[in-house]
Amino acid sequence: MTTDVRILGIDPGLRRTGWGLITARGSKLSYLACGVVTSDGDLPLALRLRELHEGLTRIVTTYTPDEVSVEETFVNKDAQATLKLGHARAVALLVPALAGLPVAEYAANLVKKTVAGNGHAEKVQIQAMVKFLLPKAEFKLADAADALAIAITHASHRGAIALDRRHAVAAGGGPGAARIAAALARLDR
């Protein structure tokens, strides 16, 4: 018997972090919700990260996903921008980990290849394929569409690729260890 799995995809960014929630039952995907969490660019970095943390925590608490997928950071010529993206990505990894949820990470080109069939697909192609795969999806910003694409990628690869458990606290040690152990046990079923 196949059960529904709620998958939260996160596209990290300091200005806008996209999120998308789908349900996967076997190979059948259903759209649940999506949006963006924003931070105020006029605030100091620490307060912007707090805004992202609070926003993602609300999403995780409200929608109670079973698994989370986050896009990996790519390095570009602007080291400062890459570092800021790294900060936002750390928040995107931390929030579900604190909630005891398993987190998978996917490279941007794998997301593009999975969703559009081309590892170098343009954003418009990704959005069109997300809309094709999830006809009820309503997204106003590319960040939300990208997050849905990340969730779709996880749904496609979760059975073939073991979740990276290096970030999980060993059962019996550290805060949230019982929740993490329970989440990992659910994956092993």
UniProtKB/Swiss-Prot annotation:
Its main location: cytoplasm. Its cofactor is Mg(2+). Its EC number is 3.1.21.10. Keywords: Cytoplasm, DNA damage, DNA recombination, DNA repair, DNA-binding, Endonuclease, Hydrolase, Magnesium, Metal-binding, Nuclease. GO terms for molecular function: crossover junction DNA endonuclease activity; DNA binding; magnesium ion binding. It catalyses: Endonucleolytic cleavage at a junction such as a reciprocal single-stranded crossover between two homologous DNA duplexes (Holliday junction). SUPFAM superfamilies: Ribonuclease H-like (SSF53098). GO terms for cellular component: cytoplasm; Holliday junction resolvase complex. Disulfide bonds: none annotated. The active site is at D11, E71, D143. The keyword Chloroplast does not apply. Pfam families: RuvC. GO terms for biological process: DNA recombination; DNA repair. It comes from the Bacteria. InterPro entries: RNaseH-like_sf, RNaseH_sf, X-over_junc_endoDNase_Mg_BS, X-over_junc_endoDNase_RuvC. Belongs to the RuvC family. The RuvA-RuvB-RuvC complex processes Holliday junction (HJ) DNA during genetic recombination and DNA repair. Endonuclease that resolves HJ intermediates. Cleaves cruciform DNA by making single-stranded nicks across the HJ at symmetrical positions within the homologous arms, yielding a 5'-phosphate and a 3'-hydroxyl group; requires a central core of homology in the junction. The consensus cleavage sequence is 5'-(A/T)TT(C/G)-3'. Cleavage occurs on the 3'-side of the TT dinucleotide at the point of strand exchange. Homodimer which binds Holliday junction (HJ) DNA. The HJ becomes 2-fold symmetrical on binding to RuvC with unstacked arms; it has a different conformation from HJ DNA in complex with RuvA. In the full resolvosome a probable DNA-RuvA(4)-RuvB(12)-RuvC(2) complex forms which resolves the HJ. This is Crossover junction endodeoxyribonuclease RuvC.
